Amino acid sequence: MTSAEQSIADYIRLLDPAERPNPYPLFARLRERGPFRIGTAPVVIVPGHADCAAVLRDPRVSVDRSLGKLQLSSMLIYDSSKTTSEQAKPSFLFLDPPDHTRLRRLVSKAFTPRVVQQLEPRITELVDDILDKHSTAGTFDAVTEFAYPLPVTVICELLGVPLEDEAQLSHWSSLLSRTLDPTSRHAAEHQVDPAELQRAGTELSGYFERLTERRRATPGPDLLSQLLTAEDAGDTLTHDELISTCALLLVAGHETTVNLIANATLALLRRPAELAALRANPERAQGVVEETLRFDPPVQLIPRIAADDLTVGELAVHRGDLVVMLIAAAQRDPAAFPDPDRFDPSRDNRHLAFGLGAHFCLGAPLARLEARVALTRFSQRVEAPRLPTDPPVYREHVNLRGPAHLPIEYAAIRPR
């Protein structure tokens, strides 16, 4: 087998559920190969840190999936009750400047670090409420009973979604997050009936349509009401843009934050000294979050479309090619991170987990805050936590990485 054939074989192995507990040896081999093409397919794999950073900043590389030679959806939600021309426009996740710049400018004021920081008391209260449900010694699932409830509650409260609707929105979010994984069409156990995805998109779109109308009639202090009146130099969000933005905030902001919290919790439980250090000094939480984003990122790869011909490393990339940046490989690149396979919350971190450039993750301040608060309160309140089994069973996603379940045994939950 040639080196190129071995790289393709290793990339395909990433789809194997048996590799989910530890895909990083595969990523290391792919990184050693450098940028490569998947046979004759219009797909280029970029595994190194410097190359990924360069591609993320390159204006010739687009998020507009309609420019690609492969058929990839640019819709987070597809409402089957509407014709193609009536569909809500793609969210700014799949738009390039100037459309992306305009939409992001209208939405970004709600997600600045200063604004997000004001949510810390409420997020702390939510985390404590979750932990209070486990007041006696025993076990709990740190995914379904800790990491999962927090982000959906936060985003639903931000949008003004009634408490009784949170479970339904969580279900839609879980289904529709699969559209964020470009490998899902190839992973058999990950495939979902397209009709089920369309039904979820139709129901979610209809839900936000009805909620928007209620907020137009009776505005509140929530983010949806703010987005309805958001204005910049006389510009406002159209109705379709508003629906797409709400869907993006829910789908993209929920699953990724769940995985960030779960991956960080697992990293700490595997390293009792780090957990003890965090308990003694809560200021270390931010370093734990940033190192988790590098060491075991919740988003493993970032897809883009080449809008023009370019060169990555020594590899020619053609217009219309799908360019897949292996962020999980790049963030263990020894050329960028000394001793990259060591979990070190004190390191100087230049990770790419939130992207770079114009498409840097809008929700990064909120995800960081939620994870920091969750880990701090976990370390302070959960007495003698341990993993009864390791490794855990991982979720179906190749791109969105996190355990499906994370059982934890503990001695007690300390009072608030």
Give the ranges of each region predicted by the language model:
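Cytochrome P450
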Residues: 1-416
